[in-house]
Amino acid sequence: MNKHSIAADEFAAKYKNGDLDDAYIMDVREEYEWEAGHLDKAHLVPMNTVPEKLDALDKTKTMYIICAHGVRSWHVTQYLLGNGFEQVVNVEGGMAEIEHHLA
């Protein structure tokens, strides 16, 4: 783990405690995945739409990037870091792991 990644259990604990209320949680899954279940405080931004939404994202907020298993979110995290975003954190394991810790 580094400053640009967080384990799902640690993320879930912060989420439950309200420690992420000022953060931007970006869910990069597809809409059908989102509809099957998502975090109330998350924003749906499918991976393929991220480039066109760069200008609308707030570089001053910490962003937590989630997907189904942590692969797409890792790629989006790397993309955002490469485009000048510094406060970007990939949630390892994605919703598959997060759900275990929020149940």
Q: What spans do the regions from the language model cover?
A:
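Rhodanese-like catalytic fold shared by cysteine-dependent sulfurtransferases
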Residues: 1-24, 30-62, 71-103
